[in-house]
Amino acid sequence: MISSYKYNPKLYFLSTFVVTYILWFTGAYLSFSSTYSGIYMLIMLPGLMAPFIISTILIAKSKNNELKKDFINRLFNLKLINLKTIPVVFLLMPAVILLSILLSIPFGGSISQFQFSGGFSFSTDFVPVLFLLLLAATFEELGWRGYAFDSLQSRYSLFKASILFGIFWSLWHFPLIFVNNSYQYEIFNQSIWYGLNFFLSILPMGIIITWMCLKNRKSIILAIIFHFLINLNQELLAITQDTKIIETGVLFLVAAAIILYDKKMFFEKLG
């Protein structure tokens, strides 16, 4: 974060939530309309871009050249990436998923979960799902890493900022449970517990992505790649929603291990 700039987390998150919620609740309504269901994604996509758009506006209007240069550098400078972390970037989520499947078997989970899913767990009428997963990772991390997280870290310790960010990131997805054919809509219709598990799983995920981003000198492109790989890995195997509950527990253990490993960094006092 830039010490010469005064971040405004309240303005950022309030603006992002208001814009996203208005667009996504509108899109949710249109997704069930026989007349407009084919174009509801035109409303949803700007909502997905809101974290990035608000971040860009605040940075552009800041009149702080150091802040602007820092954003551009973290977005395009590949030298920020620590090559030693690349194996973790690519292998962490597959390892978590495979371990979760193994742990599910004594509780009745099927070994067929090790098979490739052969498709995606949700559908859209407008944008290919794989492209949507990439868009989600890109626009979210451009906003979250471009301004949002730094704004929280300017006020709080890394640990508290990570917890707050995870809560905000989780709640940001809330309107999606009302969007026809969305992943969140599908799992909530299967079971409210599956839906709640989705929101809960975001909390440790926020800590993990934040830690990985910091270990790569806040590289935004690295955060985008890591986020996309997480999204993609969640769709590759035929993992059940029951196993995803176990997966959330594993993610919490991973997040806890990361915090203990870098305890000094997470609890370092400001100033």
From Swiss-Prot:
Supply the alphabetized keyword list. Cell membrane, Hydrolase, Membrane, Protease, Transmembrane, Transmembrane helix
Q: Which domain of life is it from?
A: Archaea
Site positions (Transition state stabilizer) are H227, N231
Record topology, Cytoplasmic segments? 31-38, 106-125, 180-192, 238-243
Keyword Protease annotated: yes
GO terms, molecular function? endopeptidase activity; peptidase activity
UniProt membrane topology term = Multi-pass membrane protein
Membrane-spanning residues? 10-30, 39-59, 83-105, 126-149, 160-179, 193-213, 220-237, 244-263
- EC number(s): the record gives 3.4.26.1
The UniProt entry, under InterPro entries, shows: MmRce1-like, Rce1/LyrA-like_dom
Give the top-level enzyme category: hydrolase
Give, from the UniProt record, the effect of changing N231D: Decreased enzymatic activity to 40 percent relative to wild-type. At higher pH 8.0 nearly loss of enzymatic activity whereas the activity of the wild-type is unchanged
Q: Which loops or segments lie on the Extracellular side of the membrane, by the record?
A: 1-9, 60-82, 150-159, 214-219, 264-271
Give the regulation of activity.
Answer: Activity is unaffected by metalloprotease inhibitors 5 mM EDTA and 5 mM Zn(2+). Activity partially inhibited by 1,10-phenanthroline and 1,7-phenanthroline.
| Known role | Protease involved in the processing of a variety of prenylated proteins containing the C-terminal CAAX motif, where C is a cysteine modified with an isoprenoid lipid, A is an aliphatic amino acid and X is any C-terminal amino acid. Proteolytically removes the C-terminal three residues of farnesylated proteins, leaving the prenylated cysteine as the new C-terminus. Hydrolysis depends on a farnesylated cysteine residue and no activity is shown towards geranylgeranylated peptides.
Sequence similarity: Belongs to the peptidase U48 family.
Name the chain's protein.
CAAX prenyl protease 2
Q: Which gene encodes it?
A: rce1
